[in-house]
């Protein structure tokens, strides 16, 4: 940073204009910007593997579709100390809609349970397309209360963008 500032300080244009230099750190150094909570809709076995289908998509969690598993926690209606291995997948028809792979999940996981994925953020809000699903709501937890920052998108929102 010092070498950049020294160079800028010696440049006549920078002296006259005095622009602000903003350095955007990106995902790699961002802490837990958001946590994403999604509902489990289906637990199914295919060719000896367990798949948990959620109401979200990989775009809501990691729109760059990287293969790293983010930190996660399950909230099951039944407590169970036994675990099983599963893949957490999204609700689209795309083969690449894989959110987490080969993860330990409660053996009692079922429809209606929830998963929280941490470390989500930075680019997820701007890179999440409205492909098959609407934009998710954004909820802030403050002093134990849920505050809606952005409501869930609906069909009226999408149609209102068109002059039809």
Features from the language model and the residues they span:
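Charged (often Lys/Glu-rich) extended helix/loop segments that serve as interaction or gating elements
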Residues: 3, 9-164
């Amino acid at each position: 940073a010092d070498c950049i500032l020294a160079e800028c300080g010696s440049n006549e244009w920078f002296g006259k204009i005095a622009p602000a230099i903003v350095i955007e750190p990106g995902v790699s150094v961002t802490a837990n910007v958001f946590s994403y909570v999604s509902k489990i809709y289906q637990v199914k076995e295919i060719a000896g593997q367990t798949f948990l289908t959620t109401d979200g998509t990989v775009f809501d969690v990691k729109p760059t579709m990287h293969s790293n598993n983010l930190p996660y926690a399950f909230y099951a209606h039944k407590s169970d100390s036994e675990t099983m291995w599963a893949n957490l997948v999204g609700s689209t028809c795309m083969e690449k809609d894989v959110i987490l792979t080969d993860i330990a999940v409660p053996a009692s996981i079922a429809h209606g349970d929830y998963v929280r994925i941490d470390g989500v953020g930075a680019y997820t809000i701007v890179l999440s397309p409205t492909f098959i699903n609407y934009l998710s709501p954004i909820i802030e937890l403050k002093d134990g209360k849920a505050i809606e920052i952005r409501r869930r998108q609906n069909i009226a929102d999408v149609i209102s963008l068109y002059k039809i």
